[in-house]
């Protein structure tokens, strides 16, 4: 499956850039990965840029109002999407003000990383690590120890 990772901006802090690069590289062992960095001067402009980048791919928005997954359940969800014929999924992290209600309404799924408020850079890193962890679970590899 192809995973399209869309972020408003890119990691600014060294730890987040380094971590993103490492987990993106690891994730590419299991999936085709495309990364799009978008920007906008307003929340509306960011949402439009995310939609444009996602194209026709089902869109999964990282949003505090969304569904929370364990690593195992995320792996199961991604496997089900692949079996359901989705060749690509787009995952999007918005800017500091989040997503517009209009964009939320167009998403296939809202996914919450948890109830904690995370800095933007850390949320990006958690996204790519969570996708990598889910891929290793699906592959039956020992990275995830439950």
From Swiss-Prot:
Q: What is its main location?
A: cytoplasm
One GO cellular component this record assigns the protein to is: cytoplasm
| Reactions catalysed according to its record | pseudouridine(1915) in 23S rRNA + S-adenosyl-L-methionine = N(3)-methylpseudouridine(1915) in 23S rRNA + S-adenosyl-L-homocysteine + H(+)
**What Gene Ontology terms describe what this protein does at the molecular function level?**
rRNA (pseudouridine-N3-)-methyltransferase activity
The alphabetized UniProt keywords are:
Cytoplasm, Methyltransferase, rRNA processing, S-adenosyl-L-methionine, Transferase
Q: Domain of life of the organism in this record?
A: Bacteria
Protein EC: 2.1.1.177
**Binding-site residues, S-adenosyl-L-methionine:** 62, 94, 113-118
Q: What class of enzyme is it?
A: transferase
Q: What is the annotated localization of this protein?
A: Cytoplasm
A matching Pfam family: SPOUT_MTase
Q: Does the keyword Metal-binding apply?
A: no
Give the matching InterPro entries: Alpha/beta_knot_MTases, RlmH-like, tRNA_m1G_MTases_N
Say which family it is in.
Answer: Belongs to the RNA methyltransferase RlmH family.
Question: What exactly does this protein do?
Answer: Specifically methylates the pseudouridine at position 1915 (m3Psi1915) in 23S rRNA.
- Share what the entry says about its subunit structure, partners included: Homodimer.
Q: What is this protein called?
A: Ribosomal RNA large subunit methyltransferase H
Give me the gene this protein comes from. Answer: rlmH
């Amino acid at each position: 499956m192809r995973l399209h990772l869309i972020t408003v901006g890119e990691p600014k802090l060294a730890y987040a850039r380094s971590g993103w690069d490492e987990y993106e590289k690891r994730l590419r062992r299991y999936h085709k990965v495309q990364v799009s960095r978008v920007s906008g001067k307003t929340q509306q402009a960011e949402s439009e840029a995310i939609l444009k980048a996602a194209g026709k791919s089902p869109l999964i928005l990282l949003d505090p109002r969304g569904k929370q997954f364990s690593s195992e359940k995320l792996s199961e969800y991604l496997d089900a999407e692949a079996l359901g014929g989705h060749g690509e999924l787009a995952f999007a992290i918005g800017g500091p003000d989040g997503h517009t209600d209009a964009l939320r309404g167009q998403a296939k799924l809202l996914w919450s990383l948890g109830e904690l408020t995370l800095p933007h850079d850390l949320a990006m890193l958690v996204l790519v690590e969570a996708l990598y962890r889910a891929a290793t679970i699906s592959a039956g590899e020992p990275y995830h120890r439950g």
